[in-house]
């Protein structure tokens, strides 16, 4: 350190004296995978792939890539504007990289780009839904194993009708949730196909490497028909996903209905745990006027 100025030496020594955990940078936050995120990914990929394919001057590609990176970095700042359409994202790229950045749009359209980010976002949300559903089903199965010999009433038309094993009842609910999980897997396979490169309606004569683009964006396959990509699948796949969510809501709603029905009895057979946070999650609370009463 003999060549360092006194202030620099002091700073280095101070850094060396910090605890190990203080010297380690905080792990980077996961980016929000919204429309802005996917537009950025598509623009980065188009720059690289088109340069490799000879559709873009390789000497120009680094300048364009740096400009796109600055747009993405600016959009990732807290409270920053995050454009969600091609026509609002492009002016930012032109500002940072020059008008030449529009050359990466060869063979593209807002139609296939928007269809692509919708599919990518839907794919992410299906994965999140599947994870939460698996957690709920696992809890049902664990409770069923613990309550195989617990006898509870079952209801028809809102009236106690027959005694049953609580474990058997819960496994019935788990079976319904398992079918919902199967539907998610089947739908995911249809959603996990890239529309990128179909341009709009009739496709394009530009020699785009659609498979390379799909691989970069993490899609398992391609949407083969250009008209289907932006006009048909973009309409029916969200409806299919909505049907899955509705089915899950029906199963969960039936379970909640049973809990609420028996909770109104003088001697309910399920008591919800009190308290908030990790102890009860706010499932039930004491009446403000009648301390003997619990409200679900």
What are these regions (language model features)?
Residues 180, 230-296:
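Glycine-rich anion/phosphate-binding loop at the beta-strand->alpha-helix junction
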Residues 210-234:
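Active-site-adjacent "gating/activation" loops or surface patches in catalytic cores
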Residues 4-19:
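Gram-negative bacterial Sec-dependent N-terminal signal peptides
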């Amino acid at each position: 350190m003999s060549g360092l100025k006194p202030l620099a030496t002091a700073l280095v020594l101070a850094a060396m004296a910090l605890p190990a955990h203080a010297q380690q940078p905080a792990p980077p936050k996961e980016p929000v995978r919204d429309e802005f995120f996917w537009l950025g990914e598509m623009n980065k990929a188009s720059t690289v792939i088109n340069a490799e394919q000879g559709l873009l001057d390789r000497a120009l590609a680094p300048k364009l890539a740096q400009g796109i990176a600055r747009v993405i970095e600016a959009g990732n700042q807290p409270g920053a504007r995050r454009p969600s359409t091609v026509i609002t994202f492009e002016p930012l790229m032109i500002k940072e990289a020059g008008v030449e950045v529009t050359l990466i749009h060869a063979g593209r359209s807002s139609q296939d780009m928007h269809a692509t980010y919708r599919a990518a976002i839907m794919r992410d949300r299906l994965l999140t839904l599947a994870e939460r559903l698996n957690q709920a089903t696992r809890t049902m199965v664990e409770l069923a194993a613990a309550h195989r010999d617990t006898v509870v009433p079952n209801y028809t038309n809102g009236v106690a009708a027959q005694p049953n094993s609580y474990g058997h009842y819960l496994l019935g609910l788990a079976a319904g949730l398992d079918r919902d999980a199967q539907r998610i897997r089947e739908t995911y396979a249809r959603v996990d196909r890239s529309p990128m490169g179909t341009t709009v309606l009739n496709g394009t004569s530009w020699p785009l490497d659609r498979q390379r683009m799909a691989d970069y964006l993490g899609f398992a396959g391609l949407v083969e028909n250009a008209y289907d990509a932006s006009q048909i699948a973009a309409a029916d796949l969200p409806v299919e996903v909505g049907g899955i969510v509705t089915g899950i809501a029906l199963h969960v709603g039936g379970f909640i209905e049973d809990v609420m029905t028996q909770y109104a009895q003088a001697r309910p057979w399920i008591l919800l745990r009190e308290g908030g946070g990790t102890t009860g999650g706010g499932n039930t609370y004491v009446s403000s006027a009648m301390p003997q009463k619990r409200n679900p």
